[in-house]
Amino acid sequence: MSKLDLNALNELPKVDRILALAETNAELEKLDAEGRVAWALDNLPGEYVLSSSFGIQAAVSLHLVNQIHPDIPVILTDTGYLFPETYRFIDELTDKLKLNLKVYRATESAAWQEARYGKLWEQGVEGIEKYNDINKVEPMNRALKELNAQTWFAGLRREQSGSRANLPVLAIQRGVFKVLPIIDWDNRTIYQYLQKHGLKYHPLWDEGYLSVGDTHTTRKWEPGMAEEETRFFGLKRECGLHEG
């Protein structure tokens, strides 16, 4: 695999960027998750960051990347509407894994947003997208800029939803390299990794949640539901961070 020039790739149209990364992605598909992280650290530019929503299976990517690159900044975009269990899970994992946690929030508080816009998540797809732009996308863009990130690790998996089914290991998003080390893992592999390393699922897993975000746009899974239907009233799967 040849060295990749981020600036040159950013000059290309999106389709051409995908083609330019195709050979590298074919090789990365042959590596295991640890190998993909190691390759990225050896071949892609720093600074390096890892994002996490501290969701159901978050402990996997947090442990995996942090053990290979200790003290990597871990970006959390906090909406102010996470479940109490999520905030406690964040504290628990930060302490257990000695995470270098970097929390970013919207410039307007949750209460101020409600006063100004109403409950955006109740205003259809357009309202949800505006909410996500304010509380997820802008804080993440600010984090990447302030941390001088050029390579961004994330824990997305193809099995999680149709919108993620064709994602490659390596892409460019928001002007930086984005690496998805566990993109091809299934639920069994996740479980085995957690067991092997003495890690836990998010506490709401035991209450029937397959995916956990904000309290007002997350539902328990019920028979007959696809996993993506448990988020954003089934109107969309992504919060905006992993789109574009």
Swiss-Prot record:
Tell me which HAMAP family the record gives.
CysH
Role, per record: Catalyzes the formation of sulfite from phosphoadenosine 5'-phosphosulfate (PAPS) using thioredoxin as an electron donor.
Gene3D superfamilies with a match to the protein in the record:
HUPs (3.40.50.620)
The record's NCBIfam families line, in alphabetical order, gives: cysH, PAPS_reductase, PRK02090.1
Q: Which UniProt keywords apply?
A: Cytoplasm, Oxidoreductase
Q: In which pathway does it act?
A: Sulfur metabolism; hydrogen sulfide biosynthesis; sulfite from sulfate: step 3/3
- This chain's protein is named Phosphoadenosine 5'-phosphosulfate reductase
Please name the taxonomic classification of the source.
Bacteria, Pseudomonadati, Pseudomonadota, Gammaproteobacteria, Enterobacterales
GO terms assigned for molecular function? phosphoadenylyl-sulfate reductase (thioredoxin) activity
